Each structure stands twice: as C-alpha cells, then as structure tokens.
Amino acid sequence: MKTRSSDAEGDSRGKMIAPVGEGNGGRKRKLVQSNEQKNDIQREEDGRAKRRIVQSSDQKNGKILRGIRGCVSPRCSAQTYQSRFSWYEQDIWTYISRFLDGKSLVKLGATNKWFYKIAMEDTVWRFACLRDLQVPVPFPVSSTWIKIYASAFDGSHSYLFRQKEKHIDWMRIGAFVLDSRTSLLTESLSGRLKFPREGTIERMLQSSGSCLINDIKSGIWIADLQLVRCPVCDLSTCDGTMQTLDARHIELFLSEGYKDGSWDYNLIGSHKLQKNASAACGAIFDLKHLKESSYSGILNLKSWTGESNDSQPKAVIAPHAVAVHTRLQENEGILVKYHTMKAGTDGDIVSIRISQQLL
C-alpha cells in the first residue's frame, strides 16, 4: 500500500510547478501595466478632446488664446539708430535758401560740397536779388545772378571807378524798372509834370525843365544819390558841392566796356536857373508808366520831403520812377546838368545822371 506522499511525489514528477515569480503574479503585473498604459492613452485622448472643445468654444466667443513664446524683437543694429529724415533733401534746402540773404548763402555754400551746389543755383540768387531789390518782375540778363547780386550789394557805386578823389558821400535809393526805352528826365517836381515839346534836348529843357531820351536799355535799374566836390575847380579851399541822381542798369558794373573805361559819360544838356532856387530836384520817369508814377506820391512833396526846415537830402522810389529833393539855403541860382552813358558808340543808354550845382 502506497502512501499519499509517494503519490504526491509521482504526480510531481509528471508536472512542472511554475515559479512563484513568473507565474500568476507576472501575468497580473503585465495586465496592470497594460491597463495603466490604456488609461494613460485614454487620459491623453480625453485631454486633447477637452482642449479641442475649449478652443472651439473660445473661438466661437471671439477669444484667441496664445501660449508663451520667445521674444522675437529685432536686435539693435547701426541702421536702427539712423533717422529716417535726410538732411540732404535738395528741394527742402532750395526752399530754405530763399529766406537767406547774400552773406548767409555764402556761409551755407562754404559748409560742404553738397551745400555749395545748392547755394550756387542761379535761381536761388535770382530770387534773392529780386527780393532784396524789391523788384517784382525779372528781366533777361547776360550775367549770372550771383555776380549781379554782388555788384548790387557789395557797396560799389559809380564814383569808385571814376573821379574817386571828388567823391564825398552817397546813399542807396533803391531799384526801379525801365521797360519802354523812353524816359522823361526832369528837374521840376512842383505841380504837374510839364511834358516837353518836340525839339532838341536843350530846347525842351529851356521850355519846361524836362527832356525825353530814347534808346534806354530795358530792365532793372539801380539809383543812388551822390554828393561830390565841386567839379569845376581843383582848389583845396573850395567847399562847393554837387548833388547827383545817379541811375544805372543793373549789369553796368559787370560790363567790360565800363570796367576798362571805354564807356564814359557824355553831357546831353544843361539848364541854368539864375535866381534863388528853393530846392535841388531831379527825377527819372518811365514814359510808358508816367501817369501811374505821377500818382504814386512822387509829386506829393509833403509826403516824403520832410519839414520845411529840413535840409537833408530826401529820395523816393516807385516801381517805374525815382526822384530826389534837397532844400537849399538862399542862393544865386542853380546849374542842372544831364549826362548819359552808352554801351559803345551806337549802343543803348546804360546810365543816367542828373546833377545840381549852386552858382
């Protein structure tokens, strides 16, 4: 009779008993791990689904949620510090230069080559010249406007080139325009202008104290009032003086004929008044604009000659006329002379002088 233990041993020989660690316990751990992975996947899917639901609901409500991102601001560079405004805008500086006087334009041109190009523009100097001379309309010229400006505002006058030793003082009157090629010269400003009859200049002066001259160069003219010593004698003791209304074309000082002395003044007429003269007067009128110049205030002596006891020389300028007036002390009379200068033998008249000298 076999015991149960032997039966058990026999049974144990026919069957393999699985280890404790690799049996049911191992399968349980695998099942747990697979279940955890499934749960993790499910949670991720549920999270994505919830995020999609939140995003869709936010989009419906008009909200846009953005996450945290890195800074994408541009890094500072040399170009970042450069201003977009350019100091070298030609149109801007051309406009600015219209408000500068001659000295300021020269200083601007001395800054650098770029500003020199701007400052040397002929249109800039034309504007400056017309502005400072207060002449509204430009005329065709043969010289550059920068040279014209310099000759008009550098302090030059006709007695710097001729009879320099006779000159005492001068005063700039201004600029006016002669465009009709015919002018009326007169020594009388009291009452209405006396229009001279036809004839020689001497006859016109004797009859009316005025004369007409033709072939005047059209354009801008500059007028000065000159005070010079007695032109008759060379005595150092003579204290006689002569007043001269000196008018010239704006380009006269730039002409070679004037600078080399080949152009000179010629006496075209004179008028002697052998009685006490209350004032020394002289005027130049453009014949085409005579009527409007007469009513511009020139013939209204009280408006510009000062008080009756004022003996200082006075002058007035109009767009197409110029006049001078100086009150005189008691005298024996006055000698008025008319000079003109031509641009060559048969050229146009480029300068006019009306001078008064006490007898």
Curated annotation (Swiss-Prot):
It is found in: Nucleus. Residues 1-60 are annotated as: Disordered. This is Probable F-box protein At3g61730. Keywords: Nucleus. The keyword Transport does not apply. Residues 1-14, 37-48 have a biased composition (Basic and acidic residues). One of its GO terms (cellular component) is nucleus. Residues 82-128 form the F-box domain. Interacts with SKP1A. Regulates tapetum degeneration and pollen maturation during anther development. The keyword Nucleotidyltransferase does not apply. Expressed in flower buds, developing anthers, pollen grains, siliques, rosette leaves and roots. Detected at lower levels in open flowers, stems and cauline leaves. Expressed in young seedling in the hydathodes, shoot apical meristem, root tips and lateral root primordia. SUPFAM superfamilies: F-box domain. It comes from Arabidopsis thaliana (Mouse-ear cress). InterPro entries: F-box-like_dom_sf. PANTHER family: F-BOX PROTEIN RMF.
